[in-house]
């Protein structure tokens, strides 16, 4: 993991908004989606990881995508540079085995 690793989290109303955000984010920055959470009735949170600047770029693209999605609404968002290891260990923001190939590709580790 890069010393400049960051986590970004965005919460929206409606699944189409989070789907649009996810697609825009992976296209805009070299980030990895580490998961999403259904946070309540029609509320969804998407969590991403990557280099600080890449996360900032991806978050801006995700917010823009949500704002362009009919019926979707950004409720809140945050970017945390270099999250503390205790935060990573407890909250669902770490890389899982399922997303490892995407992390490797985003970080340029997969040279196939």
UniProtKB/Swiss-Prot annotation:
Which SMART domains does the protein's record reference? BMC
Provide the protein's localization. Answer: Carboxysome
- Pfam families for the chain: BMC (PF00936)
Query: A GO CC term?
Result: carboxysome
Against CDD domains, the record matches this protein to: BMC_CcmK
- According to the entry, every stretch annotated as the BMC domain falls at 6-92
Q: Does the keyword Plastid apply?
A: no
Q: Which UniProt keywords apply?
A: Bacterial microcompartment, Carbon dioxide fixation, Carboxysome, Photosynthesis
Concerning InterPro entries, the annotation shows: Bact_microcomp_CS, BMC_dom, BMC_shell, CcmK, CcmK-like_sf, CcmK/CsoS1_BMC
> What Gene Ontology molecular-function terms does this entry list?
structural constituent of carboxysome shell
Biological process per Gene Ontology, one example term: carbon fixation
Principal subcellular localisation of the protein: other
Q: Does the keyword Cytoplasm apply?
A: no
Query: Which PANTHER family does the protein's record reference?
Result: CARBOXYSOME SHELL PROTEIN CCMK4, PROPANEDIOL UTILIZATION PROTEIN PDUA
Domain note for this entry?
The tight homohexamer forms a pore with an opening of about 4 Angstroms in diameter which is positively charged.
The record describes its quaternary structure and partners as: Homohexamer. Interacts with full-length CcmM. Forms mixed heterohexamers with CcmK3, probably with 1:5 CcmK3:CcmK4 stoichiometry. Only very weak interactions with CcmK1 and CcmK2 were seen.
In which family does this protein belong, per the annotation?
Belongs to the bacterial microcompartments protein family. CcmK subfamily.
- Role, per record: A probably minor shell protein component of the carboxysome, a polyhedral inclusion where RuBisCO (ribulose bisphosphate carboxylase, rbcL-rbcS) is sequestered. The central pore probably regulates metabolite flux, as might the gaps between assembled homohexamers. Homohexamers make sheets that probably form the facets of the polyhedral carboxysome. This subunit probably makes both homohexamers and heterohexamers with CcmK3.
Protein name listed in UniProt: Carboxysome shell protein CcmK4
> What organism, scientifically named, is this protein from?
Synechocystis sp. (strain ATCC 27184 / PCC 6803 / Kazusa)
